[in-house]
Amino acid sequence: MIKVTIFLLLSIFSFNLYGLELNEKVSIKYGAEQGVGSADSNTKLCSDILKYLYMDEYLSEGDKATFEKKCHNVIGNIRNTFSNKNTIKEGNEFLMSILHMKSLYGNNNNNNAGSESDVTLKSLYLSLKGSQNTEGESEVPSDDEINKTIMNFVKFNKYLLDNSNDIKKVHDFLVLTSQSNENLLPNKEKLFEQIVDQIKYFDEYFFASGGKIKVKKGYLKYNFLDIYKQPVCSAYLHLCSRYYESVSIYIRLKKVFNGIPAFLDKNCRKVKGEEFKKLMDMELKHNHIVERFDKYIISDDLYYVNMKVFDLKNVDKIQVSKIDDINNLNIYEHKETMHLSAKNLSRYIDIKKELNDEKAYKQLMSAIRKYVTTLTKADSDITYFVKQLDDEEIERFLIDLNFFLYNGFLRITEDKHLINADDVSPSYINLYRSNNIVALYILKTQYEENKLSEYRAHKFYRRKRVSNITNDMIKKDFTQTNALTNLPNLDNKKTTEYYLKEYENFVENFQPDLHDIMKLQLFFTMAFKDCNVNQNFTETSKKLWFDLLYAYDKFGWFYIHPNEVINSINKTDFVRHVLVSRNFLLKNNDQLTFLETQVAKIVEIINLSLEVDKSPDSLDFSIPMNFFNHKNGYHVMNDDKLKLLTSYEYIDSIANNYFFLSEYKNDVFRTGNNFKLYFNLPNIYSLAYQLFNELAININVITNVPLKKYLKYNASYAYFTLMNMIGKNHDIYSKGSRFVYASYILGLVFFIESHIDIARLKPKDFFFMKQSLPIIDHVYHKDLKTLKKNCTLLTDFMKINKNSQNYSLTHTEEMIKILGLLTVTLWAKEGKKSVYYDDDVSLYRKLMVSCVFNGGETIQEKLANNIEKSCDISQYGIKSKNLKDMIDINLSIHKWNPAEIEKLAYSFVLSCKMQKLMYKPMNVEKLPLEDYYKLSLAPDMVKTYHCYKLGKQAAELLESIILKKKFVRFRVTDAIDVYDFFYIKKVLSSRIKKEYNEFLQDKRAFEKKELETILNNSPFSEEQTMKLINSYECHWFTSYENFRILWMHASSNLGTGTYLKNFFSELWQNIRFLFKSKLKIRDMEYFSGDISQMNLLDYYSPMVHSESHCQEKMQVLFITLRDSKEENRSEIAQKVKSAYYQCKLDYYKNHHSDFIHRIHPNDFLNNKVYVLKQPYYLMSNVPLNNPKKVSRLFVTEGTLEYLLLDKINIPECFGPCTKLHFNKVVIKESKQRIYDMTINNALVPEIQPYNRRKYMTIYINEAYIKNIVSDALTSEEIKRHDIQKGNIKICMGKSTYLTEPILTEEHFNLTHKPVYDFSSVKHNLKVFHMKNEHLVSEDPNDDCFINYPLATINLDISDPYKEISEDLIKNLYILKSS
């Protein structure tokens, strides 16, 4: 798994870019000489813009004249509106378009530094802004303010141009893995300290002894009734709730039991109150029968009490004798005695035997039954059930109630071997599970709001509605402002008091005696015995929890309003809804508690990310623009700042749910009293999904319908259950803690899985692009409409306050929105990669995530609106109806990555603004060959759109030829002809068949005619035009895979079948011939001439040759084993696999430095040597005594072909290799190729135009940064911070060229230990401050003569020499045939 840290991003935004120095003096007086409305100043400014761009190669004289003419009017309009707050965006975007155009096409080194006549971005900004000032701006901005504004332009432009996202996976959470960031460390450490620190509340009351948790001596007389006022209760909300549930049950049932004697005095002649008290007395006395319990499990054995004794430790002991048969009890029979602890014994009462009077027994039971009915008379159904109870059931009620009040835990005699302490602690759920139904009847009718049975509960719920709340009423509660989001917040004091009020009601007017205090301490201990540091609520998560509970009870805020839930349930279905809810809560109480506590941790991380948003590492857009307007991101991002990571990337990083990089999963629930803080969290979506399955199965059982098909039509069952989880559960049989966080997560997961995740119904839906990117035909419009519909459903559902009146967002809603976005992202994720960059994520999920983050607007809609707002698309002949098609096509080219297409779209807008002023319009829909030069200058989105149309026409031509030749006469040469025709034609043909036949008659003449047409109609010189032609290639004709997709599309249109499949399979295997001659690395890097004599290693050659070598040996081995009568056929595969690994190891060991793996002088002479841009990445593989820690890796053309054809992960490519990861090696003394893109270094000849130069950054793993301590030129100290800011360069001279193998004997016998610290030995990892670059030696042999900017990265990619690539093995056969 690849983990890219923030350091990569920091390097992206280094400020020393494109020669745009920001330290020049402000030589122009602010507003002087540039009077607004002055025609001369407008003309001068337009002229200055041309000087600044220096685009001579891309602008003809006519284009320059056109620009100056159009520019004059545009400048006048912008100057007049630059002071208007509503129209200032136009001016800013115009400046951005100038900078962006210069970056793409201009010469960035044309100015003489220090000249007073220099035209800089700053001078253009000052001139354009003129003497007008925006509202609230000082008369003359300071130099620092101006520089800051220009810097923001530069940073944003670099962000748009950055292509490092090609290797991007998801960033580990920005704060929690940025251990070296001085600004973020305090916040991160504070969070951990808060979490760990709260265990002190537990330590204040408890201590561990003999594996048991006990109350400290200082609290032995404390009754714990008002513990809700203490921090321990708010730090562990769910545990405190469990405690007070036990307390309330105890107090209420004790009151019920204490009322029995007085009732008997009036209603029972044979057994009066005092006799009843003696009968039920639990004090152990001589002749009493007792039962024994151990860890709350009651033994089947009974004992007879002989006497009380005291041991030396003053511990109560009871001398007892075991009873063999309770029905034949003889107290005078001599039995063997034993001494048992009084704490583990309880009196066994058989009321019938104790009374020894049948009439008295029946009269007593009748009186108790009558007493219970007086308590349950509020509901006739319950009263009727009580009257039907027989005497034995009434007796059991009395016995169990008496046992509980005396011992403090429930008496369970069935399935005893399955119970534990959590099962016997007093709770409503445990009373129900232990069949204490009569006690629940009494508690329900005496103390609950809903006193009716489930058969009549609908009457209660119909009456129990949330009052209609207006926004004005809500504002009265939101009287505070959150410091992080600046949004209205609920009064913390009010929400806390509201929550604690319920606890106060439990304990008011109760005066506990010493016996009660012991029980209260037991309840407190039982509730907190499993307390651990991973389950607490810090101040932030507790505050939001209180807010959500208050908002639900007072306003009905939830995904589904409680009134709507009740209205959706028919009277006849109400009992079934109650039963579904009850069954789910009874079964999943623990799992819900677990989910609750883990979401609380996620809330902390979200809050921490909001704090990070205040960090200095941001793109400041207090400068108004239309870019990156996320409608559903963090609220703070919608004001004036955009982070280096967008709001999506923040949440995507949080969605990984890991504090640190530990992959080990720790059980943090019911693990006993554990003080260890685990640095990873479970995936809350997975936890909620397991609960969703339980809920869905519950619904299915009750409704008896196919689960997956009709789940959403029975959603009322789920919402009613959720209502009982977050609200006050009025079903006493499943009553328990309120699961606020769990309700929100489970509610959203249920909606996603039942309404949004269409894969549940049609697994293949919206996976249509998985194997066939990019799109060729638009057959998906209907599906995309479904996506839009579902996205709207989801975004509407996620709003917890659905009041349609004008209303400002609150902090509570913001936090739930973020939690909802996190949940949606987790739904889409297939691993720890970013959703947008993960090929395993379906198109549907990628686009759904993007749509939700944009507030229900699809990425296509958003970009189309933004483009039309800022760009006149008619410049390229594009109409509004085709704009979304163009966006879809570009999306498909970029693997449907919304982040990439957004950057591409804004690059398009900026280019469009300038090109509108520079060039004549073109019509990309019907582009004639005469205008082809315009396509080369067009934005990438326009080129891709044209390429799509060209590919579609190529596929249609191919289909027609195949059909015409009836398959059997179609040859590979026909495919080659189609390819060559479009490669030469370059534009759409209106007479495709006629021109194709003309091409077949004389290919050279056709190519010459097409080329001459382009050259003759271009306003540029022949040399410039050829450069334009060569600078752009259509996607379909650049790689084997791309061209193959075109044929895949053709085959799918022609039908299916074995013959057709085989036909195209053979075609694809041979199609590679087309590309061997087309392979071209665009970037070239200059090296000194003596490199050809250095006997360099062809680094990845052994890997390639070992595959071929071992495959041949394995074929022989397989045949031998297959034909051997002694071999077990089931073991052949494993034997071949083991032999394959051994063969590879032997080859590396014996042949990795063979002559065939060296680069020869002829390879350089024939221009067939390439170098990976990045040096050897796995530096820890290099032995400590080897000084070559930094090594440039060179490969020959043959090795390069294999690496590009295979999808194996190469560390130096940060994944699978593409042409962008290599440079072509060019000897300085060879013939100059001045129009190729050149990597800028000290060997580049002066003749090379600066605008054709490319800047290259060297990345090394951050694990090796500790070895960089000083400047190689001045010996001054170098800090990690200097590298993060992009102020360091790395020396990449001849000492880095790899001439000897890195692998040693230790690598082969697996005894090599990775080397991360080599600071104590001599090594070639040399760096220096950019400010000291003038001190670099002019000797080409000096290590630092060649140098590049340095940045850090953190990628975990294993050494490809340790892996077998199936794709490579298959491709070897294809290439071998050539």
Curated annotation (Swiss-Prot):
It is a single-pass membrane protein; Peripheral membrane protein. Disulfide bonds join C46-C71, C233-C240, C791-C851, C871-C912, C947-C1034. Its main location: host cell. One of its GO terms (cellular component) is rhoptry. The keyword Disulfide bond applies. Disruption phenotype: Conditional knockdown reduces parasite growth and proliferation. Late-ring stage parasites have irregular shape and trophozoites exhibit an abnormal stunted phenotype rather than progressing to mature trophozoites. Parasites that transition to schizonts harbor significantly lower numbers of merozoites per schizont. Delayed parasite maturation. No obvious differences in general schizont morphology or in the ability of the erythrocyte to burst. Merozoite clumping after egress. Reduced capacity of merozoites to invade an erythrocyte. Residues 1-19 form the signal peptide. The keyword S-adenosyl-L-methionine does not apply. Component of the RhopH complex. RhopH complex is composed of CLAG3.1/CLAG3.2, RhopH2 and RhopH3 with a 1:1:1 subunit stoichiometry. Interacts with CLAG3.1/CLAG3.2. Participates in the formation of new permeability pathways in Plasmodium-infected erythrocytes enabling the uptake of nutrients from the blood plasma. Required for maintaining invasion capacity of merozoites. Required for parasite growth and proliferation. This is High molecular weight rhoptry protein 2. The gene is RhopH2.
